[in-house]
Structure formats: structure tokens, C-alpha cells
């Protein structure tokens, strides 16, 4: 699982999800990529699940890059707890994804297999996304 080693503050505010991604919108390392088309919080478990789906499909022939990192804690209060008494404890870590952001990159010699692997990964993510190549822009 992807989690930060050390953070300055254990709990954070939740910002509104607005705007489009200003950086990380092109494929830099691989040949193909998954690009987000909407706002979302992607959890560390969803990132790991998508990575496993890609690796199982391509087996040993290619290389995968993960371009997002879950650096924001989301908190939750325990079940059957009365209101008040402060903010809940951190439950999971999420990455704040904006439209246009490239989430995963893949380098693989066969385009058909690469697209099939990335399609499987998209099904594991909670957002609408598309597959792009190195030449495409947002």
C-alpha cells in the first residue's frame, strides 16, 4: 500500500474539487497512459488494485509507472458515536485527482495487450478515464 512515511499534520481539511490539472497531463515515461476525465479522490487500495490488474495482464513484458500518490488523509468517526467531540481519526489515504491528470503509464511492445491491461485498470478506479498515447494531449 502507498502511504506517506511521515506527515506534518495528521488531519487535513477537505478542499473543494475544482479546476483541471495543471501538471502531469502528458505521457512522459511510457507509451500509453490512463488520463482522468473527472474529479475524484482515489484511495491507496484502488491504486494498488489497478496496479495489480495491469501487472497480471502484461505478465513480465512491460513496465508500469504510477504518477499519483495518496498524500491526503481522510478521517472518519466510529460507528454509533454522538456528534461533537472533535474530528475523527484518519481512516485511509487518498490522492486528489483532477481532470487531465495521467494516473498510470505503461510501456509495452504490443498495443492491443497494453490497451486491454489499461482498460482493466480503469475498471478498478472510481472515475471516468481514457487511454492516451504519448502523442495525445488533453
From Swiss-Prot:
Protein name: Large ribosomal subunit protein uL16
One of the protein's GO biological processes: translation
Task performed by this protein: Binds 23S rRNA and is also seen to make contacts with the A and possibly P site tRNAs.
Protein's gene: rplP
Signal sequence, renumbered to the chain: none
Subunit text: Part of the 50S ribosomal subunit.
The entry's keywords: Ribonucleoprotein, Ribosomal protein, RNA-binding, rRNA-binding, tRNA-binding
SUPFAM superfamilies associated with the record: Ribosomal protein L16p/L10e
UniProt keyword Lipoprotein, yes or no: no
Family: Belongs to the universal ribosomal protein uL16 family.
Biological source species: Mycobacterium tuberculosis (strain ATCC 25177 / H37Ra)
Amino acid at each position: 500500500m502507498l502511504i506517506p512515511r511521515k506527515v506534518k499534520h495528521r488531519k487535513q481539511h477537505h478542499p473543494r474539487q475544482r479546476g483541471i490539472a495543471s501538471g502531469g497531463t502528458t505521457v512522459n515515461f511510457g507509451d500509453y497512459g490512463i488520463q482522468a476525465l473527472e474529479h475524484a479522490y482515489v484511495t491507496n487500495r484502488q491504486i494498488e488494485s489497478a496496479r495489480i490488474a495491469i501487472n497480471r495482464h502484461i505478465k513480465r513484458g512491460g513496465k508500469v509507472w504510477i504518477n499519483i500518490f495518496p498524500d491526503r488523509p481522510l478521517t472518519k468517526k466510529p460507528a454509533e458515536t454522538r456528534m461533537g467531540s472533535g474530528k475523527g481519526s484518519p481512516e485511509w489515504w487518498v490522492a486528489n485527482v483532477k481532470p487531465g491528470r495521467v494516473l498510470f503509464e505503461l510501456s509495452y511492445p504490443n498495443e492491443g495487450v497494453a490497451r486491454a491491461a489499461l482498460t482493466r485498470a480503469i475498471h478498478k478506479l472510481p472515475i471516468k478515464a481514457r487511454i492516451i498515447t504519448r502523442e495525445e494531449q488533453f
